[in-house]
Design a protein with these regions (language model features):
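Conserved catalytic core of the tyrosine transesterase superfamily
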Residues: 1-325
């Protein structure tokens, strides 16, 4: 469902989002930021469709407990919108603030035992009146995230028609930056999804969300995060806070590291496999995937000597959320 814009920039926001989507971009997360900006603008004296310097500077201020990457995304979305307004003939302010999008947090790589414990606890979830589908959604969602290395946004945007259970394929229609790809599932995961389809989605239309709420809306990212933190607690895995995790997105990182560790242990040619893995993950470049070589070597020191020839040139000081997410 499209978001409603009610602030002083509402018509231009709707036009801006529509043009981005016509160009093939999903724009869901950016639309949410733009709606926040439009609402934020209600407290300022705004000339028709003009982002003033005062408004731009106020929006760009770092908020309490806000991460650098979230602030970066907020400010850059305002910048893109302001530039668009200028192109439409409205003299909007373009801030010269330069922000770093580098994120130095090291992802948490779950051990295989921790993954088993998380799955076992998810499988034992009881029904809950406030979230009646949680006990059915979470066990399958977590297995899809770990088994296929999907981004959480990609999983939650899956429609029934995007899940090909006959061939064991997931059709990611709106990956990062609007990219599409097909993601194969294992036989066991396909069977799990078939059971879920029969129990939860029987009779649903093809455009229904695969991971849906009781209101037939996509299961919310915040709801998934809250449930996941509860599972971590029950599994005896310390949750160190928003900045340090573990987070639901670490299941994607763990999928990659476990796969690379398996290949390295079996002496598979990583040079040949990295391009395939890169396509599977939806990365735009092999360099984004190569970063995982370092992370895998750190998580599994015993295979470092097998990866030396691959990791010697891919040890950046920090990594970009924009590339690795």
């Amino acid at each position: 469902m499209a978001l409603q814009f009610t602030g002083p920039f509402a018509p231009m926001c709707e036009q801006f989002v529509a043009e981005r989507r016509e160009a093939g971009r999903d724009y869901s997360q950016q639309e949410k930021i733009l709606r926040m900006f439009d609402n934020f603008s209600k407290d300022y004296a705004v000339e028709p469709f003009v982002v003033s310097e005062e408004l731009a500077q106020a929006w760009s201020q770092k908020r309490p407990n806000e991460t650098d990457i979230n602030r970066y995304n907020r400010v850059m979305e305002m910048q893109r919108f302001s530039k668009y307004l200028v192109e439409q003939g409205y003299p909007s302010f373009l801030t010269g603030i330069r922000l770093s999008k580098h994120y130095t947090h090291t992802p948490y790589i779950f051990t295989e035992d921790e993954i088993r414990r998380i799955f076992q606890i998810a499988d034992s979830l009881e029904t809950c009146a406030s979230v009646p589908l949680r006990h059915q959604v979470m066990p399958v969602l977590l297995r899809v995230l770990y088994g296929c290395g999907l981004r959480i946004s990609e999983a939650l945007e899956l429609r029934v028609a995007n899940v090909d259970l006959s061939n064991g394929l997931l059709h990611i229609r709106h990956g990062k930056n609007g990219r599409e790809r097909l993601v194969p599932m294992s036989e066991s995961l396909t069977q799990r999804c078939q059971i879920y389809m029969q129990n939860v989605l029987d009779g649903k239309e093809p455009d229904a969300f695969f991971f849906c709420s009781r209101l037939n809306q996509p299961y919310s990212r915040s709801g998934v995060g809250k449930s996941f933190r509860g599972l971590l607690w029950d599994a005896g895995i310390p949750y160190l806070g928003k900045e340090r995790g573990p987070s639901i997105h670490d299941l994607r990182h763990t999928f990659v590291c476990h796969r690379l560790n398996q290949w390295a242990s079996n002496e598979v040619d990583l040079t040949a496999m990295l391009p395939i893995l890169s396509k599977y993950l939806g990365h735009t470049s092999i360099s984004a995937t190569s970063w995982y070589l370092r992370l895998t070597a750190e998580a599994y020191p015993g295979i470092v000597h097998k990866m030396d020839c691959f990791t010697k040139d891919v040890f950046p000081v920090s990594w970009e959320e924009n590339d690795i997410e």
